[in-house]
């Protein structure tokens, strides 16, 4: 038994099974069910997150996927699970379909866009 304990003590800290005591010192965990304002700086997206835009400010509920970029939620509908239409920014998918980015493509026709027929 004492030989096994001695082997554990000889291992470097990064090989130990136990996490360090100050693991969350620099990155505190956001509270579940809270809303984070997405307007520059840190934001979070939760599994099955729902986003909304109110007065030009995007809001995304929850936690678990942290980024540090300015983000705007995509106002276009998403054509398939896990596909986001975001131009020149950051996109993230967490559980459901959530697209965020620094610039959203405006007026993007998706799928069944209105096509002119011969009578027009």
From Swiss-Prot:
A single GO CC term for this protein reads: membrane
InterPro entries recorded for this chain? UPF0444
Give the main localization category.
membrane
Query: How does this protein sit in the membrane?
Result: Multi-pass membrane protein
Indicate, by first and last residue, each region the UniProt record lists as having compositional bias (Basic and acidic residues).
1-11
Location(s), subcellular: Membrane
Q: Which UniProt keywords apply?
A: Membrane, Transmembrane, Transmembrane helix
What highest taxon heads this organism's lineage?
Eukaryota
Where are the residues of the annotated region Disordered? 1-36
Q: Where are the transmembrane segments?
A: 40-60, 80-100
Please tell me whether the keyword Transmembrane is annotated for this protein. Answer: yes
Q: Which family does it belong to?
A: Belongs to the TMEM263 family.
Read off the PANTHER family from this record: PTHR31443
Outline what the protein does.
May play a role in bone development.
Q: Please identify the protein, giving its name as recorded.
A: Transmembrane protein 263
The species this protein belongs to is Danio rerio
List the top taxonomic levels of the source: Eukaryota, Metazoa, Chordata, Craniata, Vertebrata
């Amino acid at each position: 038994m004492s030989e096994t304990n001695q082997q554990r003590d000889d291992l470097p800290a990064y090989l130990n099974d136990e996490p360090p005591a100050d693991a969350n010192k620099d990155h505190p965990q956001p509270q579940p069910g809270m809303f984070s304002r997405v307007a520059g700086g840190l934001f979070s997206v939760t599994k099955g997150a729902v986003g909304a835009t109110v007065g030009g400010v995007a809001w995304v509920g929850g936690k678990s996927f942290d980024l540090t970029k300015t983000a705007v939620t995509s106002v276009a509908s998403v054509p398939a699970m896990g596909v986001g239409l975001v131009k020149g920014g950051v996109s993230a998918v967490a559980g459901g379909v959530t697209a965020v980015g620094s610039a959203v493509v405006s007026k993007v026709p998706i799928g069944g866009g209105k096509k002119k027929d011969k009578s027009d």
